[in-house]
Amino acid sequence: MSAFKVSVIGGGSFGTVIANITAENGHDVGFWMRSESQAQELNRLHENSQYLPDYRLNERIHATSDMAEAVKGSRLIFVAVPSSSFRQVVSDMVPYIPEDAILVSTTKGIE
């Protein structure tokens, strides 16, 4: 299968690992994080120092706090946020989800 853009919504440890594995498999990854400063740090250092310090991340990951930018052009979107945030994050994302995108929830628990 040829490479396509994948998005990961949620900058915690699980989202970071999903983003990295996806990038290592040849896909460009739009990676949404709540914090713009953390997104900038990840883009600069290729590391998520808050959740996975000293773990080098693939350079195909592009972090942003802009939801529209994160999901634009994605064919597959992983949502990796806490269950307490899931409803709000997905509601915020709905206007930007490409029509043919597949949405996968990796959220543990029920709101």
Where are these regions (language model features)?
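NAD(P)+-binding Rossmann beta1-loop-alpha1 motif at the extreme N-terminus of oxidoreductases
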Residues: 1-53, 62-65, 92
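Rossmann-like NAD(P)(H) cofactor-binding subdomain of soluble oxidoreductases
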Residues: 57, 69-72, 76-79, 83-111
